[in-house]
A protein has these predicted regions:
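Conserved nucleotide- and phosphate/pyrophosphate-binding catalytic cores
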Residues: 23, 155, 161-330
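N-terminal Rossmann-like or analogous alpha/beta NTP/dinucleotide-binding catalytic cores
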Residues: 2-137, 286, 291
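Short, histidine-centered active-site or binding-site loop motifs used for metal coordination
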Residues: 13-15, 46-48, 145-146, 203, ...
Length: 330
């Protein structure tokens, strides 16, 4: 990395489905802000994506689409490293070493996200169970100081800290202990059809989310059909008015207007007016975002991925070499 005095930030997105407004507001805008203060490494975590079955041709295209999304959101490859996880073999090597030298079955049995995703299915892959250890390897390879994640990933970063501390204790100091960074507002943009559930690319209904590739017309319809709460007052109260609160947060983040200002502006007005104005704001955003998104051609995206891997590959290899020396297998 260019500036060794800056702290290092690492995060990533799976190319496993459509990226949506929740990803943009909850993660990508935060990353864009961070790249001016930190050495930022943003990964397309394709090995994580294949923990559930993917159609190969679709996966290949989605990898490029994730990078386009990064770029359209404002992540600048001159400031941040963007790379594909599978391009650097040290990720899977370190994951295996951590499996053997630091991780315990008891650790993984506590992971709530696996329980949520797997349910009682016996056909679930071992990779999905072991996902948090690969995530730990992703983070630890680059001497990461901070990991911006959603609330559903906090437990995995805590496991990363545990594995790093355990390895350092048993074999000698190698890993930096990373900290979790959670955005205060917008960390969880909720579903338009059910404000009790997070906006998610794996939702059973497309009414749950606004995809960043939705046509503006489709997005407007989704906003207008979004569920609301009983009563008519437009007030931010996540417990009593979760649906309206979610719309207010979305509006606030997109338009750069405080929630207090929005509440004052909609005093005496109805939900219909709020949704109409929010729909217009979303429409303007999507038109601008998609213009940038479609401007990045495949060859340019592949070059950015290669340049990123070339830049940080040596860091990963140096960490892995140090780990192997400590283990006596180098």
């Amino acid at each position: 990395m260019e500036n060794n005095t800056k702290k290092t930030v690492f995060s990533g997105v799976q190319p496993s489905g459509v990226l949506h407004l929740g990803n943009y507001l909850g993660a990508l805008t935060q990353w864009v802000e961070m790249q001016n203060k930190y050495n930022c490494i943003f990964c397309v975590v394709d090995y994580h994506a294949i923990t559930v079955k993917q159609a190969p041709k679709e996966l290949s295209g989605r990898i490029l689409d994730v990078v386009r999304t990064y770029l359209a959101a404002g992540i600048n490859p001159a400031k941040s490293v963007i790379f594909q996880q599978s391009a650097i073999t040290a990720h899977t090597e370190l994951a295996w070493i951590l499996n053997c030298a630091a991780a315990r079955m008891a650790d993984l049995n506590k992971m709530t996200q696996f329980k949520d995703k797997a349910g009682n299915k016996e056909s679930v892959s071992v990779g999905l169970y072991d996902y948090p250890v690969l995530m730990a390897a992703d983070i630890l390879l680059y001497n990461t100081d901070a990991v911006p994640v959603g609330e559903d990933q906090v437990q995995h970063v805590e496991l990363t800290r545990t594995l790093a501390q355990r390895f350092n204790r048993d074999y000698g100091q190698v890993f930096k202990i990373p900290k979790v960074v959670i955005r205060k507002q917008g960390a969880r943009i909720m579903g338009l059809d059910d404000p009790a559930k997070k906006m998610s690319k794996s939702a059973s209904s497309a009414a749950n989310y606004i995809a960043l590739t939705d046509s503006p017309e489709v997005a407007v319809k989704k906003i207008r059909r979004a569920v609301t709460d009983s009563g008519s007052e437009i007030k931010y109260d996540p417990k009593k008015k979760p649906a309206v609160s979610n719309l207010l947060v979305t509006y606030s983040l997109l338009a750069g207007i405080s929630i207090n200002e929005l509440e004052a502006g909609y005093r005496g007005k109805g939900y219909g007016e709020l949704k109409k104005d929010l729909a217009e704001e979303v429409k303007k955003f999507l038109i601008s975002f998609q213009l940038k998104y479609h401007s990045f051609k495949d060859d340019e995206v592949r070059r950015i991925l290669k340049d990123g891997a070339d830049k940080i590959g040596p860091i990963a290899e140096a960490t892995l070499k140090n780990v192997k020396i400590k283990l006596g297998i180098n």
